Curated annotation (Swiss-Prot):
InterPro entries: B_retro_matrix (IPR003322), B_retro_matrix_sf (IPR038124), Retrovr_matrix (IPR010999). This is Intracisternal A-particle Gag-related polyprotein. One of its GO terms (molecular function) is structural molecule activity. Residues 135-255 are annotated as: Disordered. It comes from the Viruses. Keywords: Transposable element. Residues 148-171, 204-215 have a biased composition (Basic and acidic residues). Intracisternal A-particle Gag-related polyprotein: Intracisternal A particles (IAPs) are defective retroviral elements. Due to extensive mutations in the envelope coding sequence, IAPs can only form defective viral particles confined to the intracisternae of the Golgi. IAPs are an important class of transposable elements that induce genomic mutations and cell transformation by disrupting gene expression.
Length: 255
């Protein structure tokens, strides 16, 4: 507990120099998480950009597994910003001295335990990278590993195909709700022609016929008057002056 408390004091001093105030409990949880994820840091870590970036790699891998506590990465970024700030270099150096003293005070037993944990984690990490197997696939590793994995993949593909076909069938047709919206209830008016619209159409047809009749009547009246005037004028002429049609040719006399 004394070692962790000393690291917490060093980090809090560095953050305070940059104007950042972090609660002691938060920093204690941060240090415990670092000690769990990267036990090498307590033995050989330092308050340098290179060592802090190396620590980030272990934190990110733990985060990808879903085992890293919330708030660790943001707090790591705050410390990283202080390490690169020239105004905080004096406090960074002071914190580094504290870290050096902690590392020197570690007993051979504590140092050996941390190194042992680090080697175990490194071996597990390298095993996963070399085999290329996921944690679930490692459980199947053995005599029938390939057969078990193949059966599992085939089952997954069949389930995926059935789910895909079901989704395809559902997507081909719209939901029934849309069809219900298309039906007409008894309370809704029919979209056909209403009675008032039919009456208006009939009246419009009668009016149109009346206008056409008046136009035709007005057009024929002048012709009738002209014809009657011509007939009366012809009747007033003497018979000799009336127009005669062409006379018939004289009869042919045989000599």
């Amino acid at each position: 507990m004394g070692i962790s408390h000393s690291i917490v004091v060093a980090l809090r001093s560095v953050l305070k120099q940059c104007g950042l105030k972090i609660a002691t409990k938060t920093l204690e949880g941060f240090v415990r998480e670092i000690d769990r994820v990267a036990p090498w840091y307590a033995c050989s870590g330092s308050l340098t950009v290179a060592s802090w970036d190396k620590l980030k790699g272990d934190l990110v891998r733990e985060q990808q597994k879903g085992k890293l506590k919330a708030g660790i990465i943001p707090l790591w970024k705050l410390v990283k910003s202080c390490l690169t700030d020239e105004d905080c270099q004096q406090m960074v150096e002071a914190g580094q001295k504290v870290l050096d003293e902690i590392q020197e005070s570690l007993s051979e037993v504590e140092r050996g335990e941390k190194v042992k944990v680090e080697r175990k984690q490194s071996a597990l990490k390298n095993l996963g990278l070399s085999t290329g197997l996921e944690p679930e696939e490692k459980r199947y590793k053995g005599k029938n590993a390939l057969g078990e994995i193949r059966k599992r993949d085939e089952k997954g593909e069949k389930k995926g195909d059935r789910a895909g076909e079901a989704h395809k069938e559902r997507s081909l047709y719209p939901p029934l709700v849309e069809f219900k919206q298309l039906t007409l209830s008894n309370s809704e008016p029919d979209e056909g022609v209403s009675t008032s619209e039919e009456t208006d159409s009939e009246e419009e047809a009668v009016r149109y016929k009346g206008e056409r009749y008046q136009q035709d009547k007005m057009a024929t009246q002048p012709r009738k008057r002209q014809k009657a005037a011509d007939e009366s004028q012809l009747a007033a002429w003497p018979p000799d002056c009336r127009l005669q049609g062409p006379s018939a040719p004289p009869l042919y006399v045989q000599r």
